[in-house]
Design a protein with these regions (language model features):
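Functional-site microenvironments in short loops/helix caps that host divalent-cation chemistry
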Residues: 1-13, 18, 28, 43-194
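A recurrent short beta-strand within the Rossmann-like NAD(P)-dependent oxidoreductase core
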Residues: 22
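Acidic-aromatic/histidine active-site loop/patch
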Residues: 31
Length: 194
């Protein structure tokens, strides 16, 4: 947060410089179909994909797939949306996985979770040029419109990762705000000096 913003959480004060080295990031959130490939490749059984704490969680929980997934009587995967079971839609963003599951998926996919600073850099660069000035939103500083992001559950659910192209960041990254929450590598801690 910067001092020009009206409301900020006290543990988000204040913007401070961080060195961000070059990195790569996916242009959309991970989808159900991408995560399903991990599940069907025995990602929950392959202990080499899990860090020690994640493996402890996995063994305690007994999970072999995401908690809100199940196979129907025809062997098709379903996901739970409140009280309803729906067939997996390939382009919906992956939801309801914990940090350990996200990290295991990333290792399987030969990726990693972005650091918070990397994610913020990718999501909030200036709308005019790449410099130290952060934009408020991925597309710049103009207030969000309904065509740019699924905010405040206005659609009543999650949306296809291909939706909201007008909300893309300068880097062509889609849905950097709204729709679902994202995991980063960092543990949630207040900024230095808080």
């Amino acid at each position: 947060a910067n001092k020009k913003q009206g409301f900020v959480f006290d543990n988000e004060k204040w913007v401070h410089p961080i060195d961000v080295k070059p990195f790569e990031i996916s242009n959309t959130p991970v989808t159900f179909s991408q995560y399903l490939a991990f599940v069907e490749d025995d990602g929950y059984q392959n202990k080499e994909l899990w860090e020690d704490e994640g493996l402890e969680w996995l063994e305690r929980s007994g999970q072999r797939h995401p908690i809100f997934w199940q196979k129907d009587e025809n062997g098709q995967w379903q996901w739970r949306w409140f009280q309803e079971w729906l067939l997996l839609s390939p382009f919906l963003p992956m939801i309801n996985v914990n940090w350990y599951e996200a990290k295991a998926y990333c290792k399987w996919a030969d990726r990693r979770l972005p650091a918070e600073a990397e994610w913020e850099y990718a999501a909030s660069m200036s709308e005019n040029e790449l410099n130290e000035e952060k934009g408020i939103y991925p597309w710049g500083n103009s207030h969000p419109e309904s065509a740019q992001a699924n905010l405040n559950s206005l659609t009543g659910g999650i949306e296809d990762v291909r939706a909201y192209a007008t909300g893309d960041s300068r880097f062509g990254l889609r849905q950097m705000i709204g729709n679902v929450w994202e995991w980063t590598e960092d543990i949630f801690n207040p900024y230095p000096g808080y």
